Swiss-Prot record:
Belongs to the VPS37 family. This is Vacuolar protein-sorting-associated protein 37 homolog 1. GO terms for biological process: catabolic process; protein transport. Component of the endosomal sorting required for transport complex I (ESCRT-I), composed of ELC, VPS28 and VPS37. Interacts with ELC. Residues 1-49 are annotated as: Disordered. Pfam families: Mod_r (PF07200). It comes from Arabidopsis thaliana (Mouse-ear cress). The keyword Protein transport applies. Residues 137-217 form the VPS37 C-terminal domain. InterPro entries: ESCRT_assembly_dom, Helix_hairpin_bin_sf, Mod_r.
């Protein structure tokens, strides 16, 4: 009998690499390479930075797992994904993402529901601009026109002109009264009283007119 132990060991040694190759990990080997053997990353590669606190939290979940379970996580992508989704940190992030998605959808629904109301408000604003605003603008223009007329009526030049007309009117009345007196149409007492009153009014207006012309008005 020949000793085939050596050949058996050799055959087992040859079969093990084949088994290992059939269970090659889904991740890149560079992810678990030691720092001393790792090569500098190119500019196109992205390195995931994990804080010490996060790493410690993940180790807590891994420390109770068996070697076979850890190997399965490294070789089975689905198992790794399931483990990743079971982490509290990932659950919190997923919950936040789901909540934000729900809130965004709700805001979109609310905006769609308010679309008819927004259109109605736009129509009302357009009506106001074309009707009520036009009426108010017309009234404002009328008030502006009245204001200009009032300012023009009471302007210094207009007042001086009216005062001059009043002076001329009194002067004409005085001359007419003199003619009546000369023609004996009025007695002396009545003439003096009326004529004095007219001339007093005339001179008072004349003084006001002169003062207004020489002032800064």
């Amino acid at each position: 009998m020949f000793n085939f132990w050596g050949s058996k060991d050799q055959q087992q040694g040859q079969s093990r690499p084949q088994e290992a190759s059939s269970q090659s990990p889904w991740y890149s080997p560079s992810l678990v390479s030691s720092p001393s053997s790792s090569r500098p990353q190119s500019s196109g590669q992205i390195s995931a930075q994990v804080s010490p606190g996060e790493a410690a939290g993940i180790i807590v979940f891994l420390k109770d797992k068996s070697v076979d379970e850890l190997r399965k996580l490294l070789s089975d992508k689905d198992a790794y994904q399931q483990f990743l989704l079971s982490l509290d940190q990932v659950k919190v992030q997923n919950n936040i993402k789901d909540e934000l998605r729900r809130e965004t959808l709700q805001l979109a629904r609310d905006n769609l529901e308010k679309e008819p109301q927004i259109m109605e408000l736009r129509n009302q604003c357009r009506i106001i601009r074309t009707t009520e605003l036009a009426t108010a603008q017309e009234k404002l223009n009328e008030l502006e026109r009245q204001k200009e007329e009032i300012l023009k009526f009471y302007s210094p030049g207009s007042l001086l002109h009216k005062l001059q007309e009043a002076m001329n009117q009194v002067d004409e009345e005085s001359e007419a009264l003199q003619e009546k007196f000369l023609e004996k149409e009025i007695d002396t007492a009545a003439f003096v009283q009326k004529y004095k009153k007219l001339r007093t009014t005339y001179h008072r207006r004349a003084l006001i007119h002169l003062a207004a012309k020489t002032s800064n008005i």
